[in-house]
């Protein structure tokens, strides 16, 4: 975390605070500009705990960072913790440090005092860096894509996403990708650091929208390659963020990793995909390309190593830096209107954050809630009370007859993007309604893939065999459009 350069006289220790301080490795006369922080995260249980921090100058060397990593690992093992891996982002110093320790792309682990330590690169950071490279270069990949009746090499272009957005936003009421804005397509320097923007543009909704526009000849046929790349990245990001034993929103990869889950087979498929990938016009291979390969190998290695502890499922969501990022957000919020604290302010804010359970109420944070409880806050302040549940039954009378006759017919063709997006939204609402009445089902629901207005909905399905979405009658969609 970046901190403000500042020197403060410490009357208690009779010294100036604010210099680079690496504890046992000594202090230097370089003024600190970063707080190098280590946090322990539970793999089996949802807990977190800040365990160490050091103050560094503008650039800590890779060999020094490697020494600090080993110091922290030794302390953790000495305290009785069984460390199985370390997580870091794509910063060059981090990569050089773990390489010095013995980790590599194909063997993402090193030995420390007889313990195997797996090295993982932060998946949200990988997605963000990949998007930044995709902004500048077309991506070629050796995955067959059907174009004009022939099998060809796929080429993904950012311009296809821009064309899709410009077409999609012309719909008056409903769109295929409502989250997309100009910030997603042309992010500035600060916006390029936002993981949310990268995840929303490289999403299943955008991939489905691209395919729907290609099917209606509103986008060129080679945009199928772009949809393939976007879809694969969405699935891979899901596979590295699963935190429940069941599917979330029907997404088959957004689950815990197990021997019966599709993760291992999908990782094998993605290894080929990323190995043969090329960023056209780039001088060298971007670090994020090998980073995905390294992280897939690392997650698979951890899953294998956990079996010796009789742990057969892995919550992959815990193998990222979100808890640490949320800790930094909590520290900044505890500094009031000063988001760039000095070293002294950092220490005070960290203490406050730990005592208050690392609660981060900042709405503009760069990651999701990690749902981990702090292991030791030194004092318990809050107690959760019992939650009360409302009776789900309702005495509101329901009319025996429902009629949508007389609804004014709109001049919106069923094949239009507007009607397709409306049909998907109506289906989304119907999916979250408890429709047990046979008459209501007849009025509202249609058979899958029987109406042209359901083209986008069919592309939104996560499973090609089993339909999990609701398909609404076109007449009902027209009533919603007219409302």
Task: Name each model feature, range by range.
Residues 27, 48-483:
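Non-catalytic regulatory appendages
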Residues 1-39:
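Structured nucleic-acid-interacting core domains from mobile-element enzymes and related host factors
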Residues 3, 42-48:
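Short connector loops/turns at beta-strand edges and beta->alpha or beta->beta junctions
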Residues 10, 44, 111:
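Acidic surface patches and DE-rich sequence motifs
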